[in-house]
């Protein structure tokens, strides 16, 4: 399994409960694909440099997880069709062996 990190920009109009429900769906997808969620960091409401869907603020969340590579495509598919997620970016984190070198 590889480690990945996904940064999500959520709608500022989502309340705390719908936001938690949305994150529960995403963590459920990771666990369904035999992965594990390592960290969920709520960065909170931040100002944006430019308008995104006519909003100048957005709520940021960082997900760190370990999952098989092909399973990331399924997670990104779910993210794309989910209302309330404006933007996202996924990166593969370096393995511990690569970090030590």
From Swiss-Prot:
Residues spanning the membrane: none
Record-given protein name: Small ribosomal subunit protein bS6
Originating organism: Oleidesulfovibrio alaskensis (strain ATCC BAA-1058 / DSM 17464 / G20) (Desulfovibrio alaskensis)
Role according to the record: Binds together with bS18 to 16S ribosomal RNA.
One of the protein's GO biological processes: translation
InterPro entries, A to Z: Ribosomal_bS6, Ribosomal_bS6_sf, Ribosomal_S6_plastid/chlpt, Transl_elong_EF1B/ribsomal_bS6
Family matches, as Pfam families: Ribosomal_S6
UniProtKB keywords: Ribonucleoprotein, Ribosomal protein, RNA-binding, rRNA-binding
Entry-linked NCBIfam families: S6 (TIGR00166)
Family to which the UniProt record says this protein belongs: Belongs to the bacterial ribosomal protein bS6 family.
SUPFAM superfamilies assigned to the protein according to its UniProt record, in alphabetical order: Ribosomal protein S6 (SSF54995)
GO cellular component terms attached to this protein's record: cytoplasm; ribonucleoprotein complex; ribosome
Highest rank taxon of the organism: Bacteria
HAMAP family xrefs: Ribosomal_bS6
